Amino acid sequence: VVLFISVNQILLFLLVLTICVILYNKVHKVPSTLNNETIDLESPEEMEEEIPVVICAAAGRMGAAVAAISSIYSNTDANVLFYIVGLKNTIPHIRKWIENSKLKEIKYKTVEFNPMILKGKIRPDASRPELLQPLNFVRYYLPLLIHKYEKVIYLDDDVIVQGDIQELSVGMQNTYMGYLDYRKQTIRDLGISPSTCSFNPGVIVANMTEWKHQRITKQLEKWMQRNVEENLYSSTLGGGVAISPMLIVFHGKYSTINPLWHVRHLGWSPDARYSEHFLQEAKLLHWNGRYKPWDYPSVHNDLWENWFIPDPSGKFKMIRPNS
């Protein structure tokens, strides 16, 4: 009997010990898991999604790209990677500008655009030669320049971003009348009403999967070639030959955004157009048109100068009345 009691006591002791061990593990498991999660969040594998932003850096107006990048970087905590696209002779300049200014902290890659890809696809037009610059066509070739992203943000260099770039979505509103030459039968045959709302392709969030699936670049090149043959888009119309093919190809394939994310036409006239209060509330300002904020005359250039970083090499200078 004594032996029997001793065995039961031992078994009871082991049972109690097992329960204690289980309870101990349960109590201490939660903080252990939290610690692991904290480490994982800080590890490269679990970092927040990277936001690719494409901006062109053109000779003669490189300060525009710098100001745009500065405004984006200063107004977000997002993980932004800038793809700065330029021609071979401009890339060393923009690199030096970034590395010798407060922008040296940004994440960026420089991408060389080869203008030979446009050979035979652009019709010469002397009325607005600046619209024929090769970098105006970079947006046609986004999947060839940037490979690994589902979405890519493309911005013209004459913008200032006052909001958080994470909020940016897609869509604009203009009308097609100002871009396509409706005197041409080929344009009329498209069935696009002149009063149909269009978008401004200076601010784009592009779905790269659909772009590749629908062979958008090939479609754009087709309409470039048609213009060489038929002169469908005059440079005297808004945007010239770079914008018009995009309006045709993307007709009905885009969505709208909050108007504060694209306050445009600031470069259409040297006279003030918007109230200061409205401009302060705007998320993105766009000086599309002839009157650029680094030039003179221009409007609301103080909002642009807030983000401009002087060129360490002294090559780029703003033009002001007293300069």
Identify the residue ranges that each predicted region occupies.
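Glycosyltransferase catalytic domains, chiefly GT-A lineage
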Residues: 1-323
